[in-house]
Amino acid sequence: YNLNLLRTMTDAIQSSKLRWCFTERNGDPFAKKNFLTVANAFYLATKGGGSFFGKVGSFEPDYEFDAVVLDDAALADFVERPVQDRFQRILWLYTADTVTAKFIQGTCVYQA
């Protein structure tokens, strides 16, 4: 059991792909890719799942400020990448140093 949000997202994506490979793909190399994407997993881990607990999981007005601050400097290379690609790299390659701060209801509960 793991409470790490990033790890939970990667586990969900991997499980979804595994399920697709063994049930829907059925050996067809051209089968429609019907598995959880990074964008889907991010939504479910934030706003989608947060809706169960009230106004959390989003940076919209009137929502609680719950946030994880990530630093991808250790993963940087000389390629300019859009934020979605940078987040995907963090998701799959993060280390403990990637998380630099955590906020719960606006209060910093962890800072590296």
Predicted regions and their residues:
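C-terminal cap of metal-dependent C-N hydrolases
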Residues: 64-112
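His/Asp/Glu-enriched, well-ordered alpha-helical/loop segment
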Residues: 1-76, 91
